[in-house]
């Protein structure tokens, strides 16, 4: 009985310490949404999340946060290092997905990572076809109305439009419509599409969705 109680105390202590490190990493990621990260800040966040994983190696959220930190590192990295860091991010997200397969945001991030990897390596585009399909379908299955999923499928879907079959194209159209219509995604997605000079195309495709949605943000380009 005493040994069981000691184990419970030890486990709670481990989880508590892991949580402190995890919160430190998560706060850093939130701060970078407003003030871009620096390499030294990314390094500190890496150290924090690695400690969280050491104390709680089966916690899926810590691997998800690790993947996000690697994404920032890839953004800041020199060109020759980008591929290696993106692969590390993908590995972290896959670890998270293995432990929490129904979390849609993880599949959305994996979809974006796969697109980035193929953009840096044309030879990988063909080999990524199955991964694209798996990540997109899982994101859609587990989070069909999740803003992160709507945005990821819209962005990657348009960027790789020519490679999709008919069913996949209709899936992209569905998420374009949801993303441009959703109050928590419409402005972020529209800003991205405008910066990529794809806004009118996206609105035109979204208008094909049946039943139609009244996508007010597209009114200016669909008159």
Task: List each language-model region with its residue ranges.
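Hydrophobic membrane-insertion alpha-helices, especially the h-region
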Residues: 1-15
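Alpha-helical repeat scaffolds
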Residues: 6-8, 42-50, 83-94, 126-140, ...
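Short coil/turn linking the two alpha-helices of tandem helical-hairpin repeats
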Residues: 25-37, 67, 72-81, 111-129, ...
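Extracytoplasmic/periplasmic/luminal assembly and interaction segments
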Residues: 29-32, 36-91
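Short coil turns that delineate tetratricopeptide repeat
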Residues: 50, 54-58, 101, 144, ...
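Terminal, low-structured helical/coil segments at or just beyond the last alpha-helical repeat
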Residues: 160-223
């Amino acid at each position: 009985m005493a040994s069981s109680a000691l184990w419970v105390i030890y486990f709670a202590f481990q989880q508590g310490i892991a949580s402190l490190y995890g919160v430190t990493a998560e706060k850093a990621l939130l701060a970078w949404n407003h003030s871009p990260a620096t390499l030294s800040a990314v390094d500190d966040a890496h150290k924090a999340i690695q400690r969280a994983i050491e104390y709680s190696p089966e916690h899926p959220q810590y691997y998800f946060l690790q993947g996000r930190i690697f994404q920032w590192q890839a953004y800041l990295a020199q060109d020759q290092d980008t591929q290696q860091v993106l692969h590390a991010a993908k590995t972290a997200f896959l670890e998270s997905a293995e432990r929490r397969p129904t979390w849609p945001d993880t599949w959305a991030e994996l979809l974006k990572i796969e697109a980035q990897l193929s953009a840096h390596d044309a030879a990988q585009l063909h080999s990524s076809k199955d991964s694209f399909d798996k990540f997109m379908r899982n994101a859609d299955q587990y989070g069909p109305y999740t803003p992160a999923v709507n945005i990821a499928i819209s962005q990657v879907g348009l960027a790789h439009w020519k490679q999709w079959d008919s069913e996949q194209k209709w899936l992209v159209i569905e998420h374009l419509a949801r993303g441009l219509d959703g109050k928590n995604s419409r402005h972020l997605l529209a800003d991205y599409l405008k910066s990529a000079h794809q806004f009118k195309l996206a609105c035109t495709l979204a208008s094909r969705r049946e039943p139609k949605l009244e996508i007010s943000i597209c009114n200016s380009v669909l008159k």
